[in-house]
């Protein structure tokens, strides 16, 4: 009898492990919309007046629900898209603003130069001397005419705006670079703020796709890193290619690059002159960030409905993605609704 018990124990353990690999419940979700004064049905299409709260009611209890409104940037079918077909693009524009902070006109002279190239070979990123020689000696093209750059400190409200036609570069791999090189320390060496840098591609159907500077994968080349400057001593890691999130003079801060915002910190009057480059990876102008949805339910946040407001007239395909998952398995269902938004 004992022999049979011993044989059963490993069999039971195997069965229990097998159960853990399976989901306790498959994902299930149904979505309905109730008709109201400004919400009606036309066949299988929900018709709603622009600006009217539209409430989706749920049955089923999945662990997670993600909502794709169907608007530009939030289309389920483009959730994995990283490039836009060239034939679908009408125009491509790189835009951003620049303003200097601190210092004066004398310390702003030739402060920043912005470059572009379709032949730059790329940085090694682990051979600092070779990379620094490469960027200094390379035959860059001006992205912005130096005479158009700011000539004195200003403020965000008076930033200089630039828009560059990127349509000629569609399908090409481009590199963008910035060179920060103050020529005077008689006053503070200005902080340079670059705001909202992005490539916007406009499609034939009027929709747009946006690639922010965070996707350019900029790499700093901190040319003064081996000088052991007193106002850079707080930077103890990756001094050659690193950026910072705190105030370190003459070092790039890329923490806002996902929205196109980045800057290089200022230096006090009399401080050693700073010198730094910022170089992107090769950029495909028709690249785009994947569309994304809005998480509206998770295992700690329950909901039986969700309200959304469409602000622009048009037709949309709203998609709800319901998911149950554990570390071994996943179950997912989609529910789609055609939405027509009218004036």
List PLM regions with ranges.
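Residue-level signature of extracellular beta-strand-rich folds
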Residues: 56-59, 67, 320
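Short, solvent-exposed loop/turn segments at the edges of extracellular beta-sandwich modules
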Residues: 183-185, 323-329
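Exposed low-complexity, polar/acidic, P/S/T/G-rich flexible segments that act as propeptides
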Residues: 185-234
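C-terminal edge beta-strand
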Residues: 195-198, 329-341
């Amino acid at each position: 009898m004992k022999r049979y018990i011993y044989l059963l124990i490993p069999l039971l353990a195997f069965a229990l492990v097998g159960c853990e690999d399976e989901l306790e419940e498959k994902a299930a979700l149904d979505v309905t919309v109730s008709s109201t004064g400004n919400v009606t049905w036309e066949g299988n299409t929900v018709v709603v007046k622009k600006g009217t709260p539209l409430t989706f009611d749920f049955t089923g209890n999945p662990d997670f629900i993600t909502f794709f409104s169907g608007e530009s940037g939030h289309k389920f079918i483009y959730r994995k898209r990283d490039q836009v077909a060239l034939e679908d693009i009408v125009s491509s524009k790189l835009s951003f603003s620049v303003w200097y902070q601190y210092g004066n006109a004398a310390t702003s002279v030739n402060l920043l130069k912005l470059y572009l190239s379709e032949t730059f070979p790329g940085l090694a990123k682990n051979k600092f001397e070779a990379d620094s020689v490469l960027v200094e000696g390379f035959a860059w093209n001006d992205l912005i005419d130096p005479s158009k750059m700011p000539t004195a400190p200003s403020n965000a409200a008076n930033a200089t705006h630039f828009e560059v036609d990127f349509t000629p570069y569609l399908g090409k791999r481009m590199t963008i670079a910035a060179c920060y090189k103050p020529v005077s320390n008689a006053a503070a060496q200005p902080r340079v703020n670059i705001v909202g840098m992005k490539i916007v591609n406009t499609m034939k159907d009027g929709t747009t796709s946006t690639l922010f500077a965070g996707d350019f994968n900029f790499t700093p080349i901190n040319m003064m890193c081996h000088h052991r400057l007193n106002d850079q001593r707080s930077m103890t890691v990756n001094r050659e290619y690193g950026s910072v999130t705190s105030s370190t003079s003459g070092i790039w801060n890329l923490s806002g690059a996902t929205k196109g915002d980045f800057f290089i910190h200022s230096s006090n009057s009399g401080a050693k002159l700073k010198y730094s480059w910022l170089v992107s990876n090769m950029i495909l102008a028709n690249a785009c960030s994947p569309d994304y949805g809005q998480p509206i339910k998770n295992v700690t946040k329950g909901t039986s409905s969700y309200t959304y407001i469409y602000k622009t007239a048009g037709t949309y395909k709203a998609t709800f993605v319901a998911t149950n998952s554990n570390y071994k398995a996943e179950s997912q269902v989609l529910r789609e609704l055609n939405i027509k938004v009218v004036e």
